[in-house]
Regions:
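Metallo-beta-lactamase
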Residues: 1-22, 38-49, 110-156
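Catalytic core of the metallo-beta-lactamase
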Residues: 17-25, 30-39, 135-158
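Pre-active-site segment of Zn-dependent metallo-hydrolases
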Residues: 27-32, 39-82, 94-103, 107-111, ...
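Histidine-centered divalent metal-coordination motifs
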Residues: 79, 83-90, 151
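Conserved phosphate-coordination/catalytic loops
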Residues: 61-64, 87, 150-153
Length: 158
């Protein structure tokens, strides 16, 4: 699992018109995929997945990304872009939406169908926007263009 460097307390100030990319999980491990992109005081989240525990984690069902960096900034989040429907990319969405339920979820038809089913179990009704290959969307300060990618699950986008 990834752990923060003990000497780092907070990131340096972001330059004017700068972009900061903050991985909150998924580095050095297979799972907990979650990346935050910061620009102009706004945040875009890409994926929000779980990590399945190994044998040396008895009694633990799921391991979530570390939400601490964004917990106090949930009002700055423009959207959560979901690249595909694997649990290591969507499994933590219900836990993040407990902090702020009205964050838009952006993804392909299959990906959103999978997360909507998961959110029904948690009694969360999401706001969603279905996107397709080649589509461009303005998500607050972020201009996004979606591209189809090959993966072991259909309807994956980058």
């Amino acid at each position: 699992m990834s752990h923060p460097h003990p000497e780092l307390t907070s990131p340096p100030p972001l330059a004017t018109n700068g972009v900061r990319v903050i991985p909150l999980g998924g580095l050095g491990e297979v799972g907990r995929n979650m990346t935050v992109i910061e620009h102009a005081g706004r945040l875009l989240i890409v994926d929000c997945g779980v990590l399945f525990p190994e044998d040396h984690h008895p009694g633990i069902d799921l391991i979530l990304p570390d939400f601490e960096y964004i917990e106090d900034r949930m009002d700055d989040v423009e959207a959560i872009v979901l690249t595909h429907g694997h649990e290591d990319h969507i499994g933590a969405v219900p836990f993040l939406l407990r902090l702020k339920a009205d964050i838009p979820l952006i993804g392909s038809t299959l990906t959103l169908a999978m997360i909507e089913a998961k959110l029904r179990e948690h009694k969360i009704k999401p706001y969603t926007l279905t996107v397709t290959e080649g589509q461009r969307e303005k998500l607050g300060v972020f201009d996004c263009e979606f591209a189809a990618v090959n993966h072991s699950i259909p309807d994956a986008l980058a």
